[in-house]
Amino acid sequence: MAKLDTLKAALEKALGKRVQNLVEATGELTLIVKADDYLDVAQILRDDPSLRFEQLIDLCGVDYLEYADGAWDGPRFAAVSQLLSVTHNWRLRLRAFASDDDFPVLPSLINVWNSVNWFEREAFDFYGIVFDGHPDLRRILTDYGFVGHPFRKDFPVSGFVEMRYDPDQKRVIYQPVTIEPRELTPRVIREDKYGGVEH
């Protein structure tokens, strides 16, 4: 039995109906679970002797608005975790979709894998995914006064405000964005004997 088949069978046996979907692509398995089962599944993935995913390597947020060809009709926001079992030499991708697109909430995995701390803060900062139960869920990379979540696909490229140093006030201030849309039409300059041809 192939390694992925063994892992797939172990996941189905340990998790049962909690498995919403198991996708195999490019030699890796992705386990998709409901938001309500997310925390319980994580606990089982870590503690079940047949699985033993001791390490969470990464977690990131994903915005599925306008996904692929635009035909996505599922929930908009997901948290995707990369897990590693040192015991069994397995890798697994765990994905859970937040049920509310306007206020995405998922349970925090900090009591299962404490390495998720800053990853969840980053997903909150960039995507606005709230991780319920996180002890210090605040912005980690953007400024504290930042408006919005910059990795959301509907966030404007130019942003809402810009910061600059004001020499009169001797401090950094916020002001509305002053970037104006530009028309990027190339300007053609002809040279008289370009390429040896008279123009």
Curated annotation (Swiss-Prot):
Keywords on record: Cell inner membrane, Cell membrane, Membrane, NAD, Quinone, Translocase, Transport, Ubiquinone
GO molecular function: NADH dehydrogenase (ubiquinone) activity; NADH:ubiquinone reductase (non-electrogenic) activity; quinone binding
Membrane spanning stretches: none
Superkingdom in the source lineage: Bacteria
Compartments reported by the entry: Cell inner membrane
EC id: 7.1.1.-
Stored InterPro entries: NADH_DH_suC, NADH_quin_OxRdtase_su_C/D-like, NADH_UbQ_OxRdtase_30kDa_su, NADH_UbQ_OxRdtase_CS
Main location: membrane
Membrane topology of the entry: Peripheral membrane protein
One GO cellular component term noted in the UniProt record for this chain: plasma membrane
Record flagged with keyword rRNA-binding: no
Matches recorded under Gene3D superfamilies: NADH:ubiquinone oxidoreductase, 30kDa subunit
Family membership: Belongs to the complex I 30 kDa subunit family.
Subunit note: NDH-1 is composed of 14 different subunits. Subunits NuoB, C, D, E, F, and G constitute the peripheral sector of the complex.
UniProt-recorded name of the protein: NADH-quinone oxidoreductase subunit C
Organism the protein comes from: Cupriavidus taiwanensis (strain DSM 17343 / BCRC 17206 / CCUG 44338 / CIP 107171 / LMG 19424 / R1) (Ralstonia taiwanensis (strain LMG 19424))
Designated gene of the protein: nuoC
